[in-house]
């Protein structure tokens, strides 16, 4: 297999959570551009005719739209049961969906903590465990987590988010330790400061926006398209010997 062929995802099926917009939508489209069919999961994803579905269908790839509230454990297990019983084998699992709650730690309510941990950490673990079982049995699979710069840093006023993303970093390594020898590669992508809805509050704060921009050697905030190459790489056979890695895509922010 030559190098370009290693990046192709023809005959593969990817499940992407948070596929309706932002980073998840860009990742879903990127995987389709590389040849994969896509199962898109999001709480508010249109069952038919969404933008992501239209773009993926235009590429000649199949798209299945599934709605799921990842905070609802019963809803999540119903999703998994449906996928495993009725849809193609999931070759690539992209745990991208996430939520964030902003409030100082001394005022951070229980429900903020519980909701964030459930969506950002517990749901990805359950999805990985249940779909991972089938990957292990088959002897192949790719699992990718969307982590965060707050996997490494504490952040300000987002304790539940920081804890959840720190946990994802360790979960990536824990699963890789157990599953790498069974043909399943588990890795994470760490987006830097990307222009998405989640960073709107930061971008609307002139002081914070400037301080962040000043630290980015690339001289700009990232765009969702900057995550396309990394997700295709980690989903493809080009990354078969990469396990437990957190691939930082931040324009150099962490290097400062």
Regions found by a protein language model. Name each.
Residues 148:
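Residue(s) in the substrate-gating loop at a strand-loop-helix junction
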Residues 128, 164, 172:
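Active-site helix of classical SDR
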Residues 36-51:
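Conserved glycine-rich Rossmann-like NAD(P)H-binding loop of the short-chain dehydrogenase/reductase
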Residues 180, 185, 242-244:
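Short, small/polar-rich loop/turn modules that mediate ligand/substrate recognition or access, typified
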Residues 125, 140, 220-249, 254:
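C-terminal substrate-recognition "lid" of short-chain dehydrogenase/reductases
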Residues 104-105, 109-117, 212:
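Substrate-binding pocket helix/loop in short-chain dehydrogenase/reductase
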Residues 20-21:
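Conserved glycine-rich cofactor-binding loop
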